[in-house]
Amino acid sequence: MAYTRGTLSFSTEDGNNYSYSKSEPYTSRYLIWSGNYYFILPKSFRLSIAPGINYGHTNYSYIYQTSLQDASGILNSSREDVLQLRGSATLFKKITDRQNAFFRAWYGSTSNDVSYSGTSPYDNDFSDTYAGASLGYNFSDKMWNVSADVALQWEKNKINDLSVEEFYPLINLSAGFSPSKKHSFRTYFHFGANYPGASEKTPNVLQQNELMYYTGNPNLGLSRQVTFNLSYNWMPVNAFSASAFVQYFGEFNLYVPVFNPYNDGKALLRTFETDCDYNRTQIGMSFNYKLLNGNLQLAASPSVSLYRVSGLFDIKRSPFYCNASATYYLGNFYFQASYQTRSLTVQGNRGVIYKDRNFYQMLAGWSRSGWNIRVSAMNLFRKDWLCSTNILSTPLYSETQYVNGNNFHQRLNISVTYTLGYGKKVKRGNEVGEQYGAASAIMK
């Protein structure tokens, strides 16, 4: 359940201040099944089949009340049923000891049935259907590891009686080169596309408060994505290693929120338009150094990110980020001190600048024979509850949102786990996994 309180002060005829409260209670239930079937075939062929089904039901309410005596408030209730079917089949072929190839085909369909009642009643039927096929190749030897796959995907989005469909290519290229044990290079390139979610394409109008209404844009199309990574690793001795990297991510024709006058200029209507090019470049390094026969380990990872957003939002930011840690091992015991600076990111499809807090931690633990006992002291001198700040600025509407929580508040954690040494291999610190259902189409 999400709950928000706020106070808005402005000049009114009677001179009284204004306050509001907002709550968003919801419940979601999911049934999830997924399978993975593996077959060994003649002539060095292998076949992998992965089907899956998700069903979900969500009840969501938006309740808004004000201090005005004559105001009736806002109540929007929604019920959603979502069904997701998906499946893929991959045929692998071993050509030689150094070469492999594969052919993959996939299909998926998600349908969302959403019914709104209350202040803004409406019914919506969404469906997203996609299918595609790809060819891939891999070559590896003592120095090289090269992979490439090319795919063609068809996707169709339908909202009530309006549909949009498109064919688009997907490309993945990667290469690794290790001339010696001390040096290695790796690069990766991806070209793809992304469709907006169903909630961003909702055609109905929902009232949020006296001055704000929300709607989607059924005509939103896909955006193009480009990813490029290049890294270098250097390990002159076992006790020391360093790496340098550059990463680029670009998304073009990206949808962003747009605010327009509504209700004869007495309110604003938030919708979405394709009016953004998003570019993020990150340059960084990392270092690891072992002392005292490996019992003391020092690590640091500084980086700088270059954000450039053009279109409706003209945003330029170049934040610096670094995390560092020192870990000491004494028999079955271990101790760690770590610190990370505040991070800043620019969220392209929201036009929001996100800032969190710096974080520091002292940790002590004991591990033996599957047991892991750990005590962590975090942010011991910070008593406030502020987690992050979200800043949105447009010509007609600006918003600064302060998010509270315990992520950066002073706290003490005690963890005791025991891991059985058979069956599925799990990652320490994440012994219990979590399953997720299909994406919701409810507009919020």
What are these regions (language model features)?
Residues 1-236, 240-365, 374-444:
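Primarily recognizes Gram-negative and organellar outer-membrane beta-barrels
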